Amino acid sequence: MNLQEDIQRIRQMMGIIVENYYDSKKLYVDMGGVLVKKMGADEGGSGGDTDYIGSELWESIKKYNPIILSATGSKNIENSKKIKTKQVQDHLKPTPKVEFVVFGPDKKIFATTTHDDLVYPNILIDDSETNIKEWESNGGIGLVHKNNQSTLEQLESYLK
């Protein structure tokens, strides 16, 4: 039995039943280093390197209605948002919702979702171990992206 099954069993024993548990949590996905190459716009650059690298990953996760969660950096914030939004619109179908934070560790504010007075951990796929540590310290489930196969295996283990 895995942790999620244990949680479900305990909830059932306590009379806490969520019809569709996975509708109560969200999947967030980083852009740079996960779906596109590092682009530099979040460091104040022009974002010239916009190669899309995440087609296999995206095709496998889009059924979970992921939300793109990306840092803009403190320089050229509006330009970074514009470039990243265009990348999402150009490469990801169906086009997902996009959320921005200024710095990567700030992503932690999205780590949990409250539904019917219950708090559920959200999942973040990110290539930054620092971002994942911050996410997990705020109650979320973090998956450090190294390659598509390992990320998908980890994700499936949480969503079984």
State the predicted function of each range.
Residues 36-38, 75-79, 108-111, 131-134, ...:
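Short catalytic/ligand-binding loop motif for oxyanion handling, primarily in non-cytosolic enzymes
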